[in-house]
Amino acid sequence: MDQVSIEMSSTPRPTMVKSKSQLSLRRSLTITFKDLAYSVTVKKKKMQILKGVSGTVTPGELVAVFGPSGSGKTTLLDILANRKESGEISGAVLINGNEIDDDYKRLCSYVVQEDVLLPTITVRETLRFYADLKLPKSWTEKEKHERIEQILEQIGLSHRADAKIGGVLPGGIVLRGLSGGEKRRVSIGCGLVTSPSIVLLDEPTSGLDTTSAMAVMKTLVELTQQKSVTVICTIHQPRSEIFKLFTKIMVLAEGRLVYYGNRPVEHFTEIGFPFPDQTNPADYILDAVTTIKEEGRADEIADRLQSSYLDQANQESSSTLTQSQLGIINASGKRKINAYNNGLFTQFLVLWKRTGLDFIRNPSNCLVRFAVAVFVGLLFGACFSGLGMDEKGVQSRSAVLFYLVINMILQPFASISLFISKRTLFNAERASKLYHTLPYYLALMFFEILACIGTAFILGTITYWFADLNPGADKYFFAMAILTLAHLAGDFFMLIISCITVQVDTSFAVGAGVATIYQLFAGFFVPINALPKSFEWLHWCNFVYYSFEALMHNEFVGETVNCGQLACPTGRDVLINLGLNNRGKGINLIIVSSFAFAFFTMVFLCLHYFHREKR
């Protein structure tokens, strides 16, 4: 057996944490799971993903969950992290022999496979964001700073602390920043802010080159050896150098545990799979498990393992427990754990600061919008400059007012990609209990509303004065108010579409169709009194119609058309010819405001209920 002996790393002796900045409240935790099973129903057919998986991981151990695709690795990790929100779960998860309590999500950190980070902020700012939201309120600024510096040293990124994360921004803008391996270490660092006792990672080396993967694994090894952290991670076909870093290997096949220990090669050799020379142990084990799966032996081997040393180890680790002490997971797998360390207002302030930095540093958020507004405003001004109040001027004034409103619902198309690009980040951070939906939404909308106000005023002001529209100050500010509200209503409506649809392309297609309907039934192309009765409702629920009507009232009521005759039409006659209502412009202002507020509320509801990380 010596020729196939692969020695795994030995388990280090636990270390004590002494200073507050190292979170002295952290305890060394042993995680025990017994008879875990998980199933989902797909098209009325029940699929068993995990079947009777048991094991114990002690402090200072670095355990790999290994197996072919579809064997249940990520599912097991989700259950251990208490983040499985769908399907049926049964079994027990114990921490130091006790059932999971409200502190579990503070003691356990889960690092997902994808590096979900905001590209425009720096490494230090990212860690500070997590520190502000995850650390207790009692921590001072100095203590938070010390903690962040410790983490930067732990993950080996002190020299890159002020570098931006980097990535592709909406619109295809590439922001240079960290490498893939460095981003992965930042993700791990975010999970270490609270100095957790248990760290769970889903394929931490996936997609990384050899050097980056080894750097990530060395970070995890140091966590176990220096901090006595319990680390469990899924992994897929690692290099032999990485494979040897693990203290134990957990092998899954078809949802069953077919091996758990520190001598996997010897085990699979004993059950009939000779180990070829010069072979990566990970590849060898994967080939063996694939053969076991093809031969239908997974249940047999798992049952034999369960009845032997694994079952004995579990009994020894929890021999003093009664059945009532087992942390049995309910059928839905859901637990209501209040894992927020800070209130809604604190969450809002932290999110407001980060969102502000992102808006300033992302050109697509403001600069591009404002530049487009200036260009379109100058174009409108050139086409409609110096309009008079004669019959031709009335027609041109009506046109410029209409197209101003239409532009207010076309500009928000830029918001769709910006909003959708942040969805994955929002879902991941909310699932990690960093913050609630409400403070995130309010912080995001604070800057979105500012951008909308700026865009409306830039475009509206340039066009207003070039076209020589009604010069009264009250007329100007009312027009700007209507344009701003129309822009906000259009922006919020496009965000509703982006919440309901999944892809950016779909959102653009649906948004374009809706915008066309808005234009057609706004009262400019087709007079309201010329519409078929069956279509009348389309303009009553059209905020573009009310916006256009308000601007027309503002521009023409009280004015007289210069027609060169004794009896010239008045401004109200102009409105009547278009079939516009005689309601006051103040009423229209209230109606458009109501549309904007209703859409604003609907965006929040869609964001809160439609988009959750599905696990």
From Swiss-Prot:
- Domain (ABC transmembrane type-2) spans 364-610
* One GO MF term: ATP binding
User: What inducers act on this gene?
Assistant: By hperosmotic shock provoked by sorbitol.
GO BP annotations, alphabetical order: aggregation involved in sorocarp development; cell motility; sorocarp morphogenesis; transmembrane transport
From which domain of life does this come?
A: Eukaryota
Which residue windows are coiled coil?
none
Q: What name does this protein carry? A: ABC transporter G family member 22
Q: Which organism is it from?
A: Dictyostelium discoideum (Social amoeba)
Which gene codes for it?
Answer: abcG22
